[in-house]
């Protein structure tokens, strides 16, 4: 292929965690990712779009859940509409065409990758959970042991300063977990075994890409 991908990339579904043995016989906790197949939905070029990219889709969408623009676009490209669509930037033109598939064998055992996903939502939490505050003295007369205490001042500037650590929503954010190692690739099952835990719930969708960091090691 003539692709000049800055990194390998694919969409995957998190299946859960298990354990595997590495080449040295050590037990390694791994996350099983159902990677692909991702179908190329669109090929963008610098001439028509201003940059080179592949738009890939993952998991078929029910026709009844498509709006008219999505249905017309899928019919025009002659590919099935997908639930999840992701764009992969390229450094140069690609030989891939609409309808081609990206599978888990894009990666190999030993590759170092980043995994992008959404962390589990933990709901609304107070300052002791969110910021590791100490509780107030549990002595006679104190009715607010888990509260944040003072959050500002009186006369000047007379407001709560930006960045004040207070009760907040915890989790549910887009997270990039860096420098995982691909322990094994299982093309017959379409899965990747990735060292350690990755963001999100089981059955959640994650974006797997070659690690951008220059650090020479990967998570065990």
Predicted feature residues:
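Extended basic (Lys/Arg/His-rich) segments that typically form rRNA-contacting surfaces
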Residues: 1-220
């Amino acid at each position: 292929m003539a692709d000049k991908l800055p990194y390998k990339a694919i969409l995957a579904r998190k299946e859960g965690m298990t354990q595997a043995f590495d080449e040295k016989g050590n037990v390694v906790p791994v996350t099983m990712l159902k990677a692909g197949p991702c179908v190329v939905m669109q090929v963008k070029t610098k001439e028509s779009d201003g940059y080179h990219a592949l738009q890939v889709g993952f998991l078929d969408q029910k026709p009844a859940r498509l709006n008219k623009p999505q249905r017309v676009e899928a019919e025009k490209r002659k590919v099935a509409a997908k639930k999840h669509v992701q764009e992969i930037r390229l450094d140069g033109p690609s030989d891939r065409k609409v309808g081609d598939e990206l599978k888990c064998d894009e990666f190999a055992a030993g590759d170092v990758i980043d995994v992008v996903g959404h962390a589990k939502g933990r709901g609304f939490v107070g300052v002791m959970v969110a910021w590791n505050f100490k509780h107030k003295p549990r002595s006679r007369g104190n009715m607010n042991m888990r509260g944040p205490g003072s959050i500002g001042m009186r006369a000047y500037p007379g407001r709560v300063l930006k960045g004040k650590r207070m009760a907040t929503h915890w989790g549910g954010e887009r997270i990039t977990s860096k420098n995982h190692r691909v322990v094994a690739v299982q093309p017959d099952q379409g899965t990747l075994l990735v060292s350690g835990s990755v963001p999100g719930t089981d059955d959640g969708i994650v974006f797997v890409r070659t690690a951008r960091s220059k650090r020479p090691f990967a998570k065990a």
